[in-house]
Amino acid sequence: MAFLKKSLFLVLFLGLVSLSICEEEKRETEEEEHDQEEDDKSEEKRFLSMIPHIVSGVAALAKHLG
């Protein structure tokens, strides 16, 4: 009977450990996705802020050539 109790406790312990590891990996994955979204947004903002400079450069070039 004691052997069965020890085996049951071991199985429960290993199950809890694996569950904890899975939850930790899930949190890390969610954090990485969140960081990636923030990086994408900042890249988009940088690109959008460059558009007026590009347009004025093209207009100046067209004026110079035209």
Curated annotation (Swiss-Prot):
Q: Report the InterPro entries cross-referenced here.
A: Frog_antimicrobial_propeptide (IPR004275), FSAP (IPR016322)
**What broad class describes the main subcellular location of this protein?**
secreted
The record's subcellular locations are:
Secreted; Target cell membrane
- UniProt GO cellular component terms: extracellular region; membrane; other organism cell membrane
- Superkingdom assignment: Eukaryota
GO terms, biological process: defense response to bacterium; defense response to fungus; innate immune response; killing of cells of another organism
Could you list this entry's UniProt keywords, alphabetically sorted: Amidation, Amphibian defense peptide, Antibiotic, Antimicrobial, Cleavage on pair of basic residues, Cytolysis, Fungicide, Hemolysis, Immunity, Innate immunity, Membrane, Secreted, Signal, Target cell membrane, Target membrane
Signal peptide bounds: 1-22
Which tissues is it found in, per the record?
A: Expressed by the skin glands.
Query: Which residues, in ranges, are excised as the propeptide?
Result: 23-46
Which portions of the sequence form the region Disordered? 25-44
| Post-translational modification Leucine amide, affected residues | L65
Acidic residues bias located where?
30-41
Query: What functional role does this protein have?
Result: Antimicrobial peptide with high activity against Gram-positive bacteria, moderate activity against Gram-negative bacteria, and moderate activity against fungi. Acts by causing bacterial membrane disruption inducing leakage of the intracellular content followed by cell death. It adopts an alpha-helical amphipathic structure in membrane environments. Also shows highly potent antiparasitic activity against Leishmania species. Shows moderate hemolytic activity on human erythrocytes (LC(50)=33 uM). Is also active on human monocytes (IC(50)=23 uM).
Q: Which family does it belong to?
A: Belongs to the frog skin active peptide (FSAP) family. Phylloseptin subfamily.
Protein name per UniProt: Phylloseptin-S4
